[in-house]
């Protein structure tokens, strides 16, 4: 059924089909249709960051930036949902067209630029959804906020989402906001992480609960840089690291239509680079900090490979667009099989 729907949706522009898909998933959630139309995955509980997940396969940020289909997406079988990236103020993002499909490679290039309705609009929808599962909220900075003052945007967002989020992801790795990736390195990273840690301490007292913080990183660093970032994230008292965001590289898509478009590449071509980043982080951290793996999961076995590389959880995005809800169940089953083999 999804294959037929995908054929119809793929006749539309990528952004139009994205918006229509979210509307349909949202409507299906309100009517309770999604749960009836999709076979739920087996229960595979896991505890990470002090949170209990019904299964380790989640939805990555970027698909539902504004929290418009939380209930509908949760009915498809995801073990957790991450919404955003959201910024303090609404912003339109980059000019259209800004999403490009490369179906031959099961890939997508996007240069969205953190288009979103703003943090207040997101939180209104989160409250309306009344979602009882694990909800991550991914936060970023506004386009016109200087990088030197980025911590102000992150702290403002953290203040607002803290009470509503199961965990908060700090996005310092999108390639589509100028200068953002510089926040992954050296003093800039330390300053941001220290500010987040101190603010979280205040919010924990204020709200009476400790909300985990995850840092999302890029796949385009050297092994040494990745190791340094991983160690810095651990030393700053963060709770997880998400690896990875999209890549600026074009390995695996050379010569394909749209391959030369500016933006971040996701999907199958980023799989190996993302998994390698997970391995480097796992070797560096030695189990001291959980890793959430995302990037290039288009088959169930790819999810198991991420877990084998050292991840505790995985997330889907491009693979979900190409393969549909069945991929969730495939990924859960593959991870369950891996666990059984390890016993």
Curated annotation (Swiss-Prot):
Q: Which GO terms describe its cellular component?
A: cytoplasm; plasma membrane
Q: Which cofactor does it need?
A: FMN
Q: Which residues form the signal peptide?
A: none
What does it catalyze?
(S)-dihydroorotate + a quinone = orotate + a quinol
Q: Name one GO biological process term.
A: 'de novo' UMP biosynthetic process
**Positions contributing to FMN binding:** 61-65, 85, 138, 171, 216, 244, 267, 296, 317-318
Q: Name one GO molecular function term.
A: dihydroorotate dehydrogenase (quinone) activity
Residues forming the catalytic site: 174 (nucleophile)
E.C. number: 1.3.5.2
Part of which pathway?
Pyrimidine metabolism; UMP biosynthesis via de novo pathway; orotate from (S)-dihydroorotate (quinone route): step 1/1
Bilayer topology reads: Peripheral membrane protein
As to how many cofactors bind and how, the note says: Binds 1 FMN per subunit.
Write out the entry's keywords from A to Z: Cell membrane, Flavoprotein, FMN, Membrane, Oxidoreductase, Pyrimidine biosynthesis
- Family membership noted in the UniProt record: Belongs to the dihydroorotate dehydrogenase family. Type 2 subfamily.
Fetch the PANTHER family from UniProt: DIHYDROOROTATE DEHYDROGENASE (QUINONE), MITOCHONDRIAL, DIHYDROOROTATE DEHYDROGENASE (QUINONE), MITOCHONDRIAL-RELATED
Q: Which HAMAP family match?
A: DHO_dh_type2
Record text on subunit structure and interactions: Monomer.
Instruction: List the protein's name.
Output: Dihydroorotate dehydrogenase (quinone)
